C-alpha cells in the first residue's frame, strides 16, 4: 500500500502545501518536510514561514529549512529519514544527484504542464499566453536535468477563454494531488510505467519579468488579451500614461480591422477603452492606476478622461 511508504515532502508555496495536505488527508506517512528558509515579507519585512512550513508544523511534522542541499551535512538530513520516496512540489532548491538517489524509489516531481511541453519556471503562464487549448500536470521521476525525467502520470484540463493564471493555478492545484496519490500507489505496487519524454516536442517556459508584462501594442489584440490573462495575478500586464504605470486586469478583443497606428485610442466610453493594435482592436475593461484599486474603464474615465482622448497614442 502507498500509505505505508516513508515519504519526504519538499515544497514551499501554497501550491505545494495543497499537495502536502492531500497526502496527509489520505493517510500517507510523511516522515519529514523540507521547505525554503523563512523570508522577509510585507512592509515590515518580518520573517514569514512558507505555507508548507505552516501546515507541517500544524501537523507536528519534522521541518528542515536548509539554504542549499549541496553541503554534505544537509544531504545527511535526507539520508537519516530513510525514505522510500521524496515528493518535490515547487520546492525552489536544486536537488543534487546524491539526494536524487537517496530514497529507494527516487524523487518524483509534480510539474504544472503536460510535459515535454513547457519545461521550466512558468508553465501555467506560457500555456495561456501561447493560446494552448489544454494544460495539466505531469508527475515525473526526477533526474539531474530541468524537468527532463521520465513521465509517470498525466492529468489534463481544458484552458477556457476566461482562464487567468490564477484560475489555472487553482485547477492544477486540484489535479496535482490526484495524480500524485495515484502515482504513489503505482510506485508502491510496482505498476508504474515510466515514459521517456520526446525531445522533439520540448518547449521551455522561461521565468516571467515585470518588463515583459508591459503591453506591446504592435502585437495582435488576441495575443494581448491572452497576455493580460496570463500575467494575472502576477506580474500583471501594464501600460504607461503620463509616466505612471496602469495595470490592466481585463480586456476583450474587437474583431474589427483598423488602419490606425498601434496604440491609438479609438473610443473611450462606457463599453470600454478601445485601442488599435498590430491586428485588431483591444477593448480595455478593467484597469488599476498606481496606488488605486482596480476599477472599470467607465469609473476610470470619470476621473481620468484626459488620459484616454481618442486619437492620442499609448506607448
Curated annotation (Swiss-Prot):
GO terms for molecular function: methionyl-tRNA formyltransferase activity. Its EC number is 2.1.2.9. InterPro entries: Fmt, Formyl_trans_C, Formyl_trans_C_sf, Formyl_transf_N, Formyl_transf_N_sf, Formyl_transferase-like_C_sf, GART_AS, Met-tRNA-FMT_C. It catalyses: L-methionyl-tRNA(fMet) + (6R)-10-formyltetrahydrofolate = N-formyl-L-methionyl-tRNA(fMet) + (6S)-5,6,7,8-tetrahydrofolate + H(+). Disulfide bonds: none annotated. Pfam families: Formyl_trans_C (PF02911), Formyl_trans_N (PF00551). SUPFAM superfamilies: FMT C-terminal domain-like, Formyltransferase. GO terms for cellular component: cytosol. It is an enzyme of class 2 (transferase). The keyword 4Fe-4S does not apply. NCBIfam families: fmt. Attaches a formyl group to the free amino group of methionyl-tRNA(fMet). The formyl group appears to play a dual role in the initiator identity of N-formylmethionyl-tRNA by promoting its recognition by IF2 and preventing the misappropriation of this tRNA by the elongation apparatus. This is Methionyl-tRNA formyltransferase. It comes from Escherichia coli O7:K1 (strain IAI39 / ExPEC).
Amino acid at each position: 500500500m502507498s500509505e505505508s511508504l516513508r515519504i519526504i515532502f519538499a515544497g514551499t508555496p501554497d501550491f505545494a502545501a495543497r499537495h502536502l495536505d492531500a497526502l496527509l488527508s489520505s493517510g500517507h506517512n510523511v516522515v519529514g518536510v523540507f521547505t525554503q528558509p523563512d523570508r522577509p515579507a510585507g512592509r515590515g519585512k518580518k520573517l514569514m514561514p512558507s505555507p508548507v512550513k505552516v501546515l507541517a508544523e500544524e501537523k507536528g511534522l519534522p521541518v528542515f529549512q536548509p539554504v542549499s542541499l549541496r553541503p554534505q551535512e544537509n544531504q545527511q538530513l535526507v539520508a537519516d529519514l530513510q525514505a522510500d520516496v521524496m515528493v518535490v512540489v515547487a520546492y525552489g532548491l536544486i536537488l543534487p544527484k546524491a539526494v536524487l538517489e537517496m530514497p529507494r524509489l527516487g524523487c518524483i516531481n509534480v510539474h504544472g504542464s503536460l510535459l515535454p511541453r513547457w519545461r521550466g519556471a512558468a508553465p501555467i503562464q506560457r500555456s495561456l499566453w501561447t493560446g494552448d487549448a489544454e494544460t495539466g500536470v505531469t508527475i515525473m521521476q526526477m533526474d539531474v536535468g530541468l524537468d527532463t525525467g521520465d513521465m509517470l502520470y498525466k492529468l489534463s484540463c481544458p484552458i477556457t477563454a476566461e482562464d487567468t493564471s490564477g484560475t489555472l493555478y487553482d485547477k492544477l492545484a486540484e489535479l496535482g494531488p490526484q495524480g500524485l496519490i495515484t502515482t504513489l500507489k503505482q510506485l508502491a505496487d510496482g505498476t508504474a510505467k515510466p515514459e521517456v519524454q520526446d525531445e522533439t516536442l520540448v518547449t521551455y517556459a522561461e521565468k516571467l519579468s515585470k518588463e515583459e508584462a508591459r503591453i506591446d501594442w504592435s502585437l495582435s489584440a488576441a495575443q494581448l488579451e491572452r497576455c493580460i490573462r496570463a500575467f494575472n495575478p502576477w506580474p500583471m500586464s501594464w501600460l504607461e500614461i503620463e509616466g505612471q504605470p496602469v495595470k490592466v486586469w481585463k480586456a476583450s478583443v474587437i474583431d474589427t480591422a483598423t488602419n490606425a497606428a498601434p496604440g491609438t485610442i479609438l473610443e473611450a466610453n462606457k463599453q470600454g477603452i478601445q485601442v488599435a493594435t498590430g491586428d485588431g482592436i483591444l477593448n480595455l475593461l478593467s484597469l488599476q492606476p498606481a496606488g488605486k484599486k482596480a476599477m472599470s474603464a467607465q469609473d476610470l474615465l470619470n476621473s481620468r478622461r484626459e488620459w484616454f482622448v481618442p486619437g492620442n497614442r499609448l506607448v
